[in-house]
């Protein structure tokens, strides 16, 4: 089976990234409870609010979806199966999703990714266990 780790009931995780004078806050809320088993073709949702806490100029917010516990080819499989809304675009060169609109201090934007577990993963015989995390910063 394929096990997705680290979904905590009603947990709100907060991460602040400081890149010089730019401070970005990422807040995630998860509805699921414990580790869940996912099947090939199933959809996983990851969403977060991203706030520009501090910045002198308008900043472009970017988010990386990190998959821990699986190899690079499987990570690529997952990233190829992500659907985003039209406010975000993916840059293959660096693996980040960029917000189309630049934000000024105090503004927040919603990031929501629908990730489909690759259907070809059903050919795997060994168990897969992984965790999905989001990381945000501003450029």
Which role does the model predict for each range below?
Residues 1-139:
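Surface-exposed, hydrophilic segments of mature proteins
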């Amino acid at each position: 089976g394929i096990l997705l780790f680290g979904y905590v009931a009603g947990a709100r995780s907060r991460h602040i990234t400081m890149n010089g004078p730019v401070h970005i806050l990422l807040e995630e809320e998860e509805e699921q409870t414990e580790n869940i088993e996912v099947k090939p073709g199933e959809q996983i949702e990851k969403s977060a609010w991203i706030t520009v806490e501090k910045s002198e100029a308008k900043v472009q917010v970017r988010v990386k979806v990190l998959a821990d516990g699986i190899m690079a080819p499987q990570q690529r499989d997952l990233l190829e199966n992500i659907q985003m809304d039209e406010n975000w675009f993916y840059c293959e060169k660096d693996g980040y999703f960029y917000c189309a609109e630049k934000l000024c201090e105090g503004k927040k934007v919603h990031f929501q990714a629908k990730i489909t577990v690759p259907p070809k993963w059903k050919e795997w015989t060994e168990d897969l266990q992984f965790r999905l995390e989001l990381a945000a910063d501003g450029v």
